[in-house]
Amino acid sequence: MRRKLTALLLFFTLLLSGCCYAPGNERASFVESWLKLPALPMEDYQSTKEHHNEEAETPSTPNESVTIEVPVVNLDEMPKREPGDFVKLRDYIPDIVVELKYATSSNFTGQVVYDFTEVYLRYSTVLKLMDVQAELRELGYRLKVWDAFRPLTAQEKLWNAKPDPQYVSNPWTGTNSHSRGNTIDVTLVNAEGREVEMPTGFDDFSTYADRDYSDCTDAAAANAMLLQEIMEKHGFKGLQTEWWHYTENTDYDIEKIFDPGTVSIWRAECNEYINLRVSPNVSAEVLTTIPDNNQFTVLGWINGFAYIDYQGTRGYVNADYMSRVE
């Protein structure tokens, strides 16, 4: 009602001032339109959470008095990576907010699904998210991550808890986008780190979570559409049934080796050196050698070999010639 009254007042003001509107040939982007929307008073909001008999949250808007400090990340000073390499997200976007729901029991399964608290994604995915975060900062927002890469063991736990392919991918026959390392579940927070109002909470399996946006408040719809436009602009595609779910447009195979829960520091234990090979086979091509007692990071295990990162080079070493440091 207040929006209609505002519109009528604006109309008469323009009429009295002699102003007129000539439609342009180009359609303004949603971001531009969203920034021009007048703020509505709190009593005009009605949260979709009332459908679930929950207390409505206060919608959050950018606070111009709060400045988002932009972290300096120089890619030239970072280890050289290939597009498909797994990297730690906060190494590249230090100010991103992380709250991995499946690292706790605060999720629809009621149990801890995986035992790591850092976000790991493909390098190409992270580069695109850097662009997303940069644009959001200009609007007074940041990304908050609820879920990202899931090992197949984690996907199996989710499937066992809710074996419905509309909401959870079958780990053995489904697309498993989260197990490919190019998919992320996100929402928006303001400069102070508070979540903005969205159509639903995370992992809501009702139709209120889809991208229709007609069954939620204007504020929730505007925030979800803002997130969607910026994510799509930088190379992501959303899942129709989940407003928070986005997949990078570069496709990858399902990752069957890397597991962030097994990441640990080891050292070579041999007479002189061990071979870092391109595949888990004793006759595979040698990428480089690792001198005795030198340390490396174990990323996963397969058939008696460790998949490791040694000074930016990734490959496989025989697990018989190494010992754990931490």
Where are the language model's segments positioned?
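Sec-dependent N-terminal signal peptides of Gram-positive bacterial secreted proteins and lipoproteins
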Residues: 2-24
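Extracytoplasmic cell-surface/polysaccharide-interacting catalytic and binding patches
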Residues: 19-146, 160-241, 247-264
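Segments that shape or occlude catalytic/ligand-binding pockets
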Residues: 151
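Short, well-ordered surface patches within globular domains
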Residues: 154
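SH3-family beta-barrel domains
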Residues: 261-275, 288-292, 299-302, 323-326
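Short alpha-helix capping/helix-loop boundary micro-motifs
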Residues: 280-285
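SH3/SH3-like beta-barrel fold
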Residues: 306-310
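A short macromolecule-binding patch
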Residues: 311-322
